[in-house]
Protein backbone atom coordinates (compact mmCIF):
# COMPACT_ATOMS: atom_id res chain seq x y z
CA UNK A 1 0.00 0.00 0.00
CA UNK A 2 1.26 3.47 -0.93
CA UNK A 3 0.56 6.47 1.26
CA UNK A 4 -0.49 8.37 -1.86
CA UNK A 5 -3.39 5.92 -2.18
CA UNK A 6 -4.13 5.65 1.54
CA UNK A 7 -5.89 7.67 4.23
CA UNK A 8 -2.86 8.59 6.33
CA UNK A 9 -4.65 10.62 9.00
CA UNK A 10 -1.97 11.21 11.63
CA UNK A 11 -2.21 14.15 14.02
CA UNK A 12 0.57 15.98 15.83
CA UNK A 13 -1.53 17.27 18.73
CA UNK A 14 -3.29 15.18 21.35
CA UNK A 15 -7.06 15.88 21.57
CA UNK A 16 -7.97 17.50 24.88
CA UNK A 17 -10.68 14.97 25.77
CA UNK A 18 -8.42 11.92 25.32
CA UNK A 19 -7.25 10.81 28.77
CA UNK A 20 -5.78 7.32 28.45
CA UNK A 21 -2.83 6.63 26.18
CA UNK A 22 -4.65 4.21 23.88
CA UNK A 23 -7.33 6.81 23.14
CA UNK A 24 -4.70 9.49 22.51
CA UNK A 25 -2.57 7.34 20.23
CA UNK A 26 -5.45 5.80 18.29
CA UNK A 27 -6.66 9.30 17.45
CA UNK A 28 -3.18 10.64 16.66
CA UNK A 29 -2.23 7.58 14.59
CA UNK A 30 -5.37 7.95 12.48
CA UNK A 31 -6.96 4.69 13.63
CA UNK A 32 -10.30 6.05 14.85
CA UNK A 33 -12.38 9.20 14.88
CA UNK A 34 -15.04 10.19 17.40
CA UNK A 35 -18.58 10.47 16.05
CA UNK A 36 -20.42 11.07 19.34
CA UNK A 37 -19.92 10.25 23.01
CA UNK A 38 -18.75 6.63 23.17
CA UNK A 39 -19.12 6.14 19.39
CA UNK A 40 -16.15 5.85 17.02
CA UNK A 41 -15.55 5.40 13.31
CA UNK A 42 -12.76 2.96 12.47
CA UNK A 43 -10.42 4.38 9.84
CA UNK A 44 -8.46 2.07 7.50
CA UNK A 45 -5.36 2.00 9.72
CA UNK A 46 -7.33 0.95 12.79
CA UNK A 47 -9.54 -1.48 10.93
CA UNK A 48 -6.50 -3.38 9.66
CA UNK A 49 -5.50 -4.04 13.27
CA UNK A 50 -8.99 -5.07 14.33
CA UNK A 51 -9.32 -7.43 11.37
CA UNK A 52 -6.12 -9.15 12.51
CA UNK A 53 -7.59 -9.67 15.96
CA UNK A 54 -10.77 -11.04 14.39
CA UNK A 55 -8.79 -13.42 12.17
CA UNK A 56 -6.93 -14.96 15.10
CA UNK A 57 -10.16 -15.21 17.10
CA UNK A 58 -11.92 -16.98 14.21
CA UNK A 59 -9.06 -19.41 13.64
CA UNK A 60 -8.90 -20.46 17.28
CA UNK A 61 -12.68 -20.63 17.73
CA UNK A 62 -13.03 -22.75 14.60
CA UNK A 63 -10.16 -24.98 15.72
CA UNK A 64 -11.95 -25.49 19.05
CA UNK A 65 -15.06 -26.73 17.24
CA UNK A 66 -17.23 -23.62 17.47
CA UNK A 67 -19.54 -22.68 14.58
CA UNK A 68 -19.87 -19.08 13.40
CA UNK A 69 -23.31 -17.49 13.17
CA UNK A 70 -24.50 -13.90 12.95
CA UNK A 71 -27.44 -12.72 15.04
CA UNK A 72 -29.36 -9.43 14.77
CA UNK A 73 -28.15 -6.56 16.90
CA UNK A 74 -31.79 -5.45 17.40
CA UNK A 75 -33.66 -7.84 19.70
CA UNK A 76 -37.38 -8.13 20.57
CA UNK A 77 -38.38 -7.29 24.13
CA UNK A 78 -40.35 -10.54 24.45
CA UNK A 79 -37.16 -12.60 24.74
CA UNK A 80 -35.75 -10.33 27.45
CA UNK A 81 -39.07 -10.43 29.27
CA UNK A 82 -38.96 -14.24 29.19
CA UNK A 83 -35.53 -14.26 30.83
CA UNK A 84 -36.54 -11.55 33.31
CA UNK A 85 -33.75 -9.20 32.24
CA UNK A 86 -35.98 -6.60 30.56
CA UNK A 87 -36.77 -5.18 34.00
CA UNK A 88 -33.44 -6.11 35.61
CA UNK A 89 -30.91 -4.72 33.16
CA UNK A 90 -31.31 -1.00 33.84
CA UNK A 91 -30.63 2.09 31.72
CA UNK A 92 -27.57 0.54 30.00
CA UNK A 93 -30.08 -1.36 27.85
CA UNK A 94 -31.03 0.92 24.96
CA UNK A 95 -34.75 0.36 24.38
CA UNK A 96 -36.72 1.45 21.34
CA UNK A 97 -40.05 0.97 19.61
CA UNK A 98 -40.74 0.21 15.96
CA UNK A 99 -43.49 1.84 13.92
CA UNK A 100 -45.98 -0.72 15.24
CA UNK A 101 -45.19 0.32 18.83
CA UNK A 102 -43.45 -2.98 19.58
CA UNK A 103 -40.59 -2.92 22.08
CA UNK A 104 -37.03 -3.79 21.05
CA UNK A 105 -33.54 -3.26 22.41
CA UNK A 106 -30.08 -2.86 20.93
CA UNK A 107 -28.27 -5.96 22.11
CA UNK A 108 -25.56 -5.56 24.75
CA UNK A 109 -25.30 -9.36 24.76
CA UNK A 110 -27.08 -12.26 23.05
CA UNK A 111 -27.95 -14.95 25.63
CA UNK A 112 -31.68 -14.66 24.96
CA UNK A 113 -31.35 -14.69 21.17
CA UNK A 114 -29.04 -17.70 21.04
CA UNK A 115 -31.20 -19.62 23.52
CA UNK A 116 -34.25 -18.91 21.39
CA UNK A 117 -32.33 -20.20 18.36
CA UNK A 118 -31.29 -23.35 20.21
CA UNK A 119 -34.78 -24.16 21.49
CA UNK A 120 -36.12 -23.95 17.95
CA UNK A 121 -33.31 -25.90 16.26
CA UNK A 122 -32.31 -28.55 18.83
CA UNK A 123 -34.54 -31.49 19.70
CA UNK A 124 -32.25 -34.39 20.64
CA UNK A 125 -29.20 -35.02 22.81
CA UNK A 126 -27.58 -36.39 19.64
CA UNK A 127 -27.18 -32.80 18.38
CA UNK A 128 -25.09 -31.89 21.42
CA UNK A 129 -22.76 -30.41 22.42
CA UNK A 130 -23.14 -27.37 20.19
CA UNK A 131 -21.01 -24.22 20.43
CA UNK A 132 -21.93 -21.18 18.29
CA UNK A 133 -20.17 -17.83 18.11
CA UNK A 134 -20.42 -14.49 16.35
CA UNK A 135 -18.39 -11.31 15.95
CA UNK A 136 -20.97 -8.58 16.24
CA UNK A 137 -21.50 -4.95 17.20
CA UNK A 138 -22.86 -4.46 20.72
CA UNK A 139 -24.27 -1.41 22.47
CA UNK A 140 -24.42 -0.53 26.15
CA UNK A 141 -25.68 2.93 27.03
CA UNK A 142 -22.91 3.76 29.52
CA UNK A 143 -23.76 6.74 31.71
CA UNK A 144 -20.25 8.18 31.28
CA UNK A 145 -18.48 6.79 28.21
CA UNK A 146 -14.77 7.42 28.63
CA UNK A 147 -11.28 6.29 27.74
CA UNK A 148 -12.04 5.87 24.04
CA UNK A 149 -12.55 2.22 23.14
CA UNK A 150 -11.85 1.11 26.70
CA UNK A 151 -15.33 2.12 27.83
CA UNK A 152 -17.36 3.16 24.82
CA UNK A 153 -21.05 2.64 24.20
CA UNK A 154 -20.70 0.72 20.93
CA UNK A 155 -18.08 -1.99 20.63
CA UNK A 156 -17.17 -5.11 18.65
CA UNK A 157 -17.39 -8.37 20.56
CA UNK A 158 -16.91 -12.05 19.90
CA UNK A 159 -19.54 -13.89 21.91
CA UNK A 160 -19.96 -17.65 21.92
CA UNK A 161 -22.61 -19.83 23.56
CA UNK A 162 -22.51 -23.57 24.09
CA UNK A 163 -25.32 -26.04 24.85
CA UNK A 164 -24.97 -29.32 26.73
CA UNK A 165 -27.00 -32.22 28.05
CA UNK A 166 -24.93 -32.47 31.26
CA UNK A 167 -22.34 -30.72 33.41
CA UNK A 168 -19.49 -32.98 32.27
CA UNK A 169 -20.01 -31.90 28.66
CA UNK A 170 -20.19 -28.23 29.69
CA UNK A 171 -16.94 -28.56 31.64
CA UNK A 172 -15.20 -30.13 28.65
CA UNK A 173 -16.21 -27.27 26.33
CA UNK A 174 -15.42 -24.68 29.02
CA UNK A 175 -11.90 -26.08 29.34
CA UNK A 176 -11.56 -26.04 25.55
CA UNK A 177 -12.63 -22.39 25.44
CA UNK A 178 -10.20 -21.54 28.24
CA UNK A 179 -7.39 -23.01 26.15
CA UNK A 180 -8.64 -21.31 22.97
CA UNK A 181 -8.60 -17.94 24.75
CA UNK A 182 -5.08 -18.56 26.01
CA UNK A 183 -4.06 -19.44 22.45
CA UNK A 184 -5.67 -16.27 21.08
CA UNK A 185 -3.97 -13.87 23.47
CA UNK A 186 -0.65 -15.69 23.16
CA UNK A 187 -0.78 -15.46 19.37
CA UNK A 188 -1.60 -11.77 19.64
CA UNK A 189 1.60 -11.30 21.64
CA UNK A 190 -0.09 -10.00 24.78
CA UNK A 191 1.06 -10.33 28.39
CA UNK A 192 -2.13 -11.62 30.00
CA UNK A 193 -3.50 -13.56 32.96
CA UNK A 194 -6.63 -15.72 33.18
CA UNK A 195 -8.18 -15.22 36.63
CA UNK A 196 -11.04 -16.73 38.62
CA UNK A 197 -13.93 -14.28 38.62
CA UNK A 198 -17.35 -13.52 40.00
CA UNK A 199 -20.17 -14.21 37.54
CA UNK A 200 -21.82 -10.80 38.01
CA UNK A 201 -25.03 -9.87 36.19
CA UNK A 202 -24.63 -12.51 33.48
CA UNK A 203 -25.25 -15.18 36.11
CA UNK A 204 -24.01 -18.74 36.40
CA UNK A 205 -21.75 -20.57 38.76
CA UNK A 206 -18.17 -20.53 37.45
CA UNK A 207 -16.18 -18.03 35.41
CA UNK A 208 -12.74 -16.76 34.43
CA UNK A 209 -11.67 -13.34 33.21
CA UNK A 210 -8.73 -12.76 30.87
CA UNK A 211 -6.79 -9.60 31.66
CA UNK A 212 -4.09 -7.86 29.67
CA UNK A 213 -1.60 -6.52 32.21
CA UNK A 214 -1.14 -2.75 31.96
CA UNK A 215 -0.47 -0.04 34.53
CA UNK A 216 -3.50 1.89 33.26
CA UNK A 217 -5.88 -1.04 33.81
CA UNK A 218 -9.11 -0.50 35.73
CA UNK A 219 -9.00 -3.85 37.53
CA UNK A 220 -6.73 -5.43 40.11
CA UNK A 221 -5.37 -8.78 38.95
CA UNK A 222 -4.22 -11.05 41.75
CA UNK A 223 -1.77 -13.90 41.17
CA UNK A 224 0.72 -16.01 43.07
CA UNK A 225 4.44 -15.45 42.64
CA UNK A 226 5.02 -19.20 42.83
CA UNK A 227 2.08 -20.95 41.14
CA UNK A 228 -0.67 -20.63 38.53
CA UNK A 229 -3.20 -19.28 41.05
CA UNK A 230 -4.89 -16.10 39.78
CA UNK A 231 -8.15 -14.30 40.56
CA UNK A 232 -9.69 -10.87 40.31
CA UNK A 233 -10.09 -8.69 43.40
CA UNK A 234 -13.73 -9.69 43.91
CA UNK A 235 -12.97 -13.41 43.87
CA UNK A 236 -9.52 -13.72 45.44
CA UNK A 237 -9.64 -15.47 48.81
CA UNK A 238 -7.97 -13.49 51.59
CA UNK A 239 -5.79 -15.69 53.81
CA UNK A 240 -4.47 -14.06 57.02
CA UNK A 241 -0.71 -13.80 57.33
CA UNK A 242 -1.06 -14.59 61.04
CA UNK A 243 -1.91 -18.13 62.08
CA UNK A 244 -2.22 -17.72 65.87
CA UNK A 245 -3.91 -14.98 67.91
CA UNK A 246 -1.38 -13.35 70.30
CA UNK A 247 -2.12 -13.45 74.02
CA UNK A 248 -3.56 -10.26 75.61
CA UNK A 249 -1.08 -7.78 77.07
CA UNK A 250 -3.38 -4.79 77.72
CA UNK A 251 -6.37 -4.10 79.92
CA UNK A 252 -9.70 -3.09 78.42
CA UNK A 253 -10.27 0.66 78.82
CA UNK A 254 -12.84 3.20 77.67
CA UNK A 255 -11.24 6.29 76.09
CA UNK A 256 -12.67 9.66 75.10
CA UNK A 257 -11.95 10.15 71.39
CA UNK A 258 -13.62 13.43 70.35
CA UNK A 259 -11.32 14.00 67.37
CA UNK A 260 -11.39 10.48 65.94
CA UNK A 261 -14.22 10.02 63.46
CA UNK A 262 -12.09 7.96 61.07
CA UNK A 263 -9.47 5.24 61.31
CA UNK A 264 -6.81 7.70 60.11
CA UNK A 265 -7.70 10.18 62.89
CA UNK A 266 -7.72 7.40 65.50
CA UNK A 267 -4.24 6.32 64.42
CA UNK A 268 -2.87 9.87 64.26
CA UNK A 269 -4.39 11.24 67.47
CA UNK A 270 -3.99 8.23 69.76
CA UNK A 271 -0.88 6.49 68.48
CA UNK A 272 -2.57 3.23 67.58
CA UNK A 273 -1.06 1.06 64.87
CA UNK A 274 -3.58 0.85 62.05
CA UNK A 275 -3.47 -2.96 62.13
CA UNK A 276 -4.68 -2.68 65.76
CA UNK A 277 -7.92 -0.98 64.67
CA UNK A 278 -11.13 -2.28 63.12
CA UNK A 279 -13.84 -0.83 60.90
CA UNK A 280 -17.41 -1.73 61.88
CA UNK A 281 -19.68 -1.40 58.85
CA UNK A 282 -23.44 -1.71 59.29
CA UNK A 283 -25.39 -3.04 56.29
CA UNK A 284 -28.94 -4.07 55.52
CA UNK A 285 -29.72 -7.67 56.32
CA UNK A 286 -31.41 -10.20 54.06
CA UNK A 287 -34.35 -10.12 56.47
CA UNK A 288 -36.32 -6.91 55.97
CA UNK A 289 -35.71 -4.32 58.68
CA UNK A 290 -32.67 -6.14 60.06
CA UNK A 291 -29.15 -4.71 60.22
CA UNK A 292 -25.90 -6.70 60.26
CA UNK A 293 -22.42 -5.59 61.37
CA UNK A 294 -19.44 -6.49 59.16
CA UNK A 295 -16.03 -5.96 60.72
CA UNK A 296 -12.66 -5.74 58.97
CA UNK A 297 -9.25 -4.59 60.11
CA UNK A 298 -8.55 -0.86 59.87
CA UNK A 299 -5.99 -1.27 57.08
CA UNK A 300 -8.22 -3.60 55.04
CA UNK A 301 -11.11 -2.90 52.67
CA UNK A 302 -14.48 -4.64 52.73
CA UNK A 303 -15.09 -6.81 49.66
CA UNK A 304 -18.70 -6.01 48.81
CA UNK A 305 -19.08 -8.98 46.48
CA UNK A 306 -18.05 -11.42 49.21
CA UNK A 307 -20.20 -9.64 51.79
CA UNK A 308 -23.32 -9.75 49.61
CA UNK A 309 -22.96 -13.52 49.28
CA UNK A 310 -23.47 -14.03 53.04
CA UNK A 311 -26.91 -15.44 53.76
CA UNK A 312 -27.59 -12.83 56.48
CA UNK A 313 -26.78 -9.88 54.18
CA UNK A 314 -28.98 -8.20 51.57
CA UNK A 315 -27.83 -8.49 47.95
CA UNK A 316 -26.94 -6.00 46.56
CA UNK A 317 -25.09 -4.60 49.55
CA UNK A 318 -26.71 -1.51 51.12
CA UNK A 319 -24.99 0.51 53.84
CA UNK A 320 -27.16 1.66 56.74
CA UNK A 321 -27.93 5.38 56.88
CA UNK A 322 -26.97 7.58 59.82
CA UNK A 323 -30.64 7.68 60.82
CA UNK A 324 -30.77 3.87 60.86
CA UNK A 325 -27.53 3.68 62.86
CA UNK A 326 -28.74 6.06 65.55
CA UNK A 327 -32.12 4.37 65.79
CA UNK A 328 -30.58 0.91 66.19
CA UNK A 329 -27.37 1.68 68.10
CA UNK A 330 -27.50 5.26 69.37
CA UNK A 331 -24.20 6.32 67.83
CA UNK A 332 -22.78 7.46 64.50
CA UNK A 333 -20.58 5.58 62.06
CA UNK A 334 -17.25 6.72 63.52
CA UNK A 335 -17.90 5.24 66.97
CA UNK A 336 -19.16 1.70 66.33
CA UNK A 337 -17.73 -1.61 67.48
CA UNK A 338 -18.67 -5.21 68.29
CA UNK A 339 -18.67 -4.93 72.12
CA UNK A 340 -22.26 -4.62 73.42
CA UNK A 341 -23.50 -4.12 69.87
CA UNK A 342 -27.20 -5.09 69.61
CA UNK A 343 -26.74 -6.53 66.10
CA UNK A 344 -25.47 -9.75 64.58
CA UNK A 345 -21.73 -9.44 63.92
CA UNK A 346 -19.63 -11.13 61.25
CA UNK A 347 -15.87 -10.57 61.42
CA UNK A 348 -13.13 -11.08 58.87
CA UNK A 349 -10.59 -13.84 59.37
CA UNK A 350 -7.83 -11.33 60.11
CA UNK A 351 -9.96 -9.66 62.79
CA UNK A 352 -10.42 -13.02 64.52
CA UNK A 353 -6.64 -13.19 65.00
CA UNK A 354 -6.26 -9.71 66.55
CA UNK A 355 -5.44 -8.89 70.16
CA UNK A 356 -5.14 -5.65 72.14
CA UNK A 357 -7.06 -3.73 69.48
CA UNK A 358 -9.26 -0.63 69.42
CA UNK A 359 -12.97 -0.49 68.57
CA UNK A 360 -15.78 2.04 68.69
CA UNK A 361 -17.73 1.93 71.97
CA UNK A 362 -21.16 2.48 70.35
CA UNK A 363 -21.16 5.86 72.12
CA UNK A 364 -20.32 8.98 70.15
CA UNK A 365 -16.72 10.13 70.67
CA UNK A 366 -15.70 7.08 72.69
CA UNK A 367 -13.62 3.96 71.89
CA UNK A 368 -12.47 0.88 73.73
CA UNK A 369 -8.73 0.17 73.60
CA UNK A 370 -7.04 -3.06 74.65
CA UNK A 371 -9.92 -5.23 73.40
CA UNK A 372 -9.36 -9.00 73.28
CA UNK A 373 -11.53 -11.82 71.98
CA UNK A 374 -12.94 -14.35 74.44
CA UNK A 375 -11.80 -12.24 77.41
CA UNK A 376 -13.91 -9.16 76.61
CA UNK A 377 -16.37 -10.52 74.07
CA UNK A 378 -17.04 -13.83 72.32
CA UNK A 379 -15.73 -14.52 68.83
CA UNK A 380 -18.71 -14.09 66.45
CA UNK A 381 -19.12 -15.67 63.03
CA UNK A 382 -15.89 -15.53 61.02
CA UNK A 383 -15.88 -15.15 57.22
CA UNK A 384 -13.69 -13.99 54.35
CA UNK A 385 -14.85 -10.36 54.09
CA UNK A 386 -11.95 -8.34 52.75
CA UNK A 387 -10.00 -7.59 49.62
CA UNK A 388 -6.61 -9.26 49.46
CA UNK A 389 -3.49 -7.12 49.71
CA UNK A 390 -0.11 -7.70 48.12
CA UNK A 391 1.99 -10.09 50.16
CA UNK A 392 -0.94 -12.14 51.48
CA UNK A 393 -0.40 -15.91 51.35
CA UNK A 394 -1.63 -17.50 48.13
CA UNK A 395 -4.83 -19.50 48.77
CA UNK A 396 -3.29 -22.57 47.13
CA UNK A 397 -0.52 -22.58 49.73
CA UNK A 398 2.19 -21.74 47.20
CA UNK A 399 3.95 -18.40 47.50
CA UNK A 400 2.49 -14.97 48.14
CA UNK A 401 0.10 -12.79 46.17
CA UNK A 402 1.17 -10.14 43.67
CA UNK A 403 -1.28 -7.43 42.56
CA UNK A 404 -1.05 -5.77 39.15
CA UNK A 405 -3.43 -3.67 37.12
CA UNK A 406 -5.24 -5.34 34.27
CA UNK A 407 -7.64 -4.63 31.41
CA UNK A 408 -10.36 -7.22 31.02
CA UNK A 409 -10.49 -8.39 27.40
CA UNK A 410 -12.24 -11.75 27.77
CA UNK A 411 -14.66 -13.52 30.08
CA UNK A 412 -15.94 -17.09 30.08
CA UNK A 413 -18.87 -18.37 32.15
CA UNK A 414 -20.58 -21.58 33.04
CA UNK A 415 -24.15 -20.31 32.94
CA UNK A 416 -25.79 -23.57 33.95
CA UNK A 417 -29.53 -23.58 33.24
CA UNK A 418 -30.33 -19.94 34.06
CA UNK A 419 -31.40 -18.98 30.55
CA UNK A 420 -32.43 -22.39 29.24
CA UNK A 421 -34.89 -22.81 32.13
CA UNK A 422 -36.32 -19.33 31.67
CA UNK A 423 -36.77 -19.83 27.91
CA UNK A 424 -37.65 -23.55 28.21
CA UNK A 425 -34.75 -24.72 26.06
CA UNK A 426 -34.70 -28.51 26.29
CA UNK A 427 -34.15 -31.66 24.23
CA UNK A 428 -35.00 -35.32 24.58
CA UNK A 429 -32.25 -37.05 26.51
CA UNK A 430 -30.79 -40.49 26.00
CA UNK A 431 -33.55 -41.96 28.19
CA UNK A 432 -36.26 -40.31 26.11
CA UNK A 433 -37.10 -37.73 28.78
CA UNK A 434 -36.79 -33.93 28.40
CA UNK A 435 -33.46 -32.46 29.52
CA UNK A 436 -33.02 -28.74 30.21
CA UNK A 437 -29.78 -27.71 28.52
CA UNK A 438 -26.75 -26.41 30.40
CA UNK A 439 -25.07 -23.41 28.81
CA UNK A 440 -21.66 -21.80 28.60
CA UNK A 441 -20.96 -18.21 27.53
CA UNK A 442 -17.63 -16.97 26.18
CA UNK A 443 -16.87 -13.33 25.28
CA UNK A 444 -13.91 -11.39 23.90
CA UNK A 445 -13.94 -7.63 23.50
CA UNK A 446 -12.40 -7.52 20.03
CA UNK A 447 -12.21 -3.74 19.76
CA UNK A 448 -11.05 -3.51 23.38
CA UNK A 449 -8.16 -5.88 22.63
CA UNK A 450 -6.79 -3.29 20.20
CA UNK A 451 -6.83 -0.56 22.84
CA UNK A 452 -5.46 -2.89 25.54
CA UNK A 453 -2.53 -3.88 23.32
CA UNK A 454 -1.60 -0.21 22.98
CA UNK A 455 -1.89 0.36 26.74
CA UNK A 456 0.61 -2.44 27.17
CA UNK A 457 3.10 -1.37 24.51
CA UNK A 458 3.94 2.25 23.66
CA UNK A 459 6.60 4.90 24.20
CA UNK A 460 6.91 8.66 23.88
CA UNK A 461 6.99 8.35 20.08
CA UNK A 462 3.79 6.36 19.69
CA UNK A 463 2.43 2.84 19.48
CA UNK A 464 4.71 -0.21 19.48
CA UNK A 465 2.91 -2.98 17.59
CA UNK A 466 4.15 -6.54 17.51
CA UNK A 467 4.19 -8.40 14.19
CA UNK A 468 0.88 -10.14 14.87
CA UNK A 469 -1.11 -6.93 15.36
CA UNK A 470 0.66 -4.26 13.31
CA UNK A 471 -1.45 -2.64 10.58
CA UNK A 472 1.59 -3.02 8.33
CA UNK A 473 4.67 -5.09 9.06
CA UNK A 474 7.12 -2.90 7.15
CA UNK A 475 7.38 0.84 6.60
CA UNK A 476 9.32 1.46 3.40
CA UNK A 477 10.60 5.04 3.48
CA UNK A 478 12.47 6.39 0.44
CA UNK A 479 14.49 9.59 0.77
CA UNK A 480 14.31 11.72 -2.39
CA UNK A 481 11.81 9.39 -4.00
CA UNK A 482 11.57 11.83 -6.89
CA UNK A 483 15.02 10.74 -8.13
CA UNK A 484 15.16 7.89 -10.63
CA UNK A 485 17.69 5.78 -8.73
CA UNK A 486 15.78 5.89 -5.43
CA UNK A 487 12.37 5.43 -7.04
CA UNK A 488 13.47 2.44 -9.13
CA UNK A 489 15.16 0.71 -6.18
CA UNK A 490 12.21 1.42 -3.89
CA UNK A 491 9.58 0.21 -6.36
CA UNK A 492 11.57 -2.97 -7.05
CA UNK A 493 11.96 -3.72 -3.34
CA UNK A 494 8.29 -2.93 -2.70
CA UNK A 495 7.27 -5.42 -5.39
CA UNK A 496 9.59 -8.10 -3.97
CA UNK A 497 8.37 -7.63 -0.40
CA UNK A 498 4.68 -7.69 -1.30
CA UNK A 499 5.22 -10.72 -3.55
CA UNK A 500 6.85 -12.46 -0.57
CA UNK A 501 3.67 -11.87 1.44
CA UNK A 502 4.77 -8.94 3.58
CA UNK A 503 2.39 -6.11 4.42
CA UNK A 504 4.23 -2.97 3.37
CA UNK A 505 3.34 0.70 3.64
CA UNK A 506 5.40 2.65 1.11
CA UNK A 507 5.69 6.30 2.12
CA UNK A 508 5.76 7.91 -1.32
CA UNK A 509 4.82 11.39 -0.14
CA UNK A 510 6.64 14.07 -2.12
CA UNK A 511 9.61 16.15 -1.04
CA UNK A 512 7.36 18.64 0.75
CA UNK A 513 7.14 16.02 3.50
CA UNK A 514 10.50 15.90 5.28
CA UNK A 515 12.22 12.63 6.25
CA UNK A 516 11.73 13.59 9.90
CA UNK A 517 7.97 13.81 9.48
CA UNK A 518 7.90 10.49 7.63
CA UNK A 519 9.90 8.77 10.37
CA UNK A 520 7.75 10.34 13.10
CA UNK A 521 4.53 9.20 11.42
CA UNK A 522 5.74 5.62 11.03
CA UNK A 523 6.83 5.52 14.68
CA UNK A 524 3.54 7.05 15.81
CA UNK A 525 1.58 4.42 13.87
CA UNK A 526 3.86 1.79 15.37
CA UNK A 527 4.94 -0.18 12.30
CA UNK A 528 7.56 -2.57 13.71
CA UNK A 529 10.09 -2.70 10.84
CA UNK A 530 11.39 0.29 8.90
CA UNK A 531 13.46 0.20 5.72
CA UNK A 532 14.99 3.44 4.44
CA UNK A 533 16.10 3.74 0.81
CA UNK A 534 18.50 6.58 0.06
CA UNK A 535 20.82 7.46 -2.81
CA UNK A 536 23.79 7.47 -0.42
CA UNK A 537 22.97 3.98 0.87
CA UNK A 538 22.35 2.65 -2.62
CA UNK A 539 25.76 3.93 -3.69
CA UNK A 540 27.23 1.58 -1.07
CA UNK A 541 24.84 -1.25 -2.00
CA UNK A 542 22.97 -0.89 1.31
CA UNK A 543 19.59 -0.08 2.78
CA UNK A 544 18.93 1.10 6.34
CA UNK A 545 16.92 -1.10 8.72
CA UNK A 546 15.52 -0.15 12.11
CA UNK A 547 13.13 -1.99 14.42
CA UNK A 548 10.54 0.11 16.23
CA UNK A 549 11.97 -0.83 19.64
CA UNK A 550 15.62 -0.21 18.73
CA UNK A 551 17.38 3.12 19.10
CA UNK A 552 19.93 2.65 16.32
CA UNK A 553 19.53 1.76 12.65
CA UNK A 554 21.75 -0.73 10.86
CA UNK A 555 22.97 -1.06 7.29
CA UNK A 556 21.74 -4.06 5.31
CA UNK A 557 23.17 -5.21 1.98
CA UNK A 558 20.49 -4.74 -0.65
CA UNK A 559 20.67 -8.36 -1.75
CA UNK A 560 20.15 -9.64 1.83
CA UNK A 561 17.12 -7.58 2.84
CA UNK A 562 14.48 -10.14 1.90
CA UNK A 563 16.25 -13.00 3.67
CA UNK A 564 16.82 -10.82 6.74
CA UNK A 565 13.16 -9.82 7.00
CA UNK A 566 11.90 -13.35 6.42
CA UNK A 567 13.99 -14.49 9.38
CA UNK A 568 13.08 -11.55 11.59
CA UNK A 569 9.37 -11.04 11.09
CA UNK A 570 6.93 -13.31 12.89
CA UNK A 571 4.36 -14.54 10.36
UniProtKB/Swiss-Prot annotation:
InterPro entries, alphabetized: aa-tRNA-synt_IIb (IPR002314), aa-tRNA-synth_II (IPR006195), aa-tRNA-synth_II/BPL/LPL (IPR045864), Anticodon-bd (IPR004154), Anticodon-bd_dom_sf (IPR036621), Pro-tRNA-ligase_IIa (IPR002316), Pro-tRNA-synth_IIa_bac-type (IPR004500), Pro-tRNA-Synthase_IIa_type1 (IPR023717)
Subcellular location as annotated: Cytoplasm
Keyword terms, alphabetized: Aminoacyl-tRNA synthetase, ATP-binding, Cytoplasm, Ligase, Nucleotide-binding, Protein biosynthesis
Ribosomal protein among keywords: no
Family stated for the protein in its record: Belongs to the class-II aminoacyl-tRNA synthetase family. ProS type 1 subfamily.
Complex and partners: Homodimer.
UniProt note: domains: Consists of three domains: the N-terminal catalytic domain, the editing domain and the C-terminal anticodon-binding domain.
Designated name of the protein: Proline--tRNA ligase
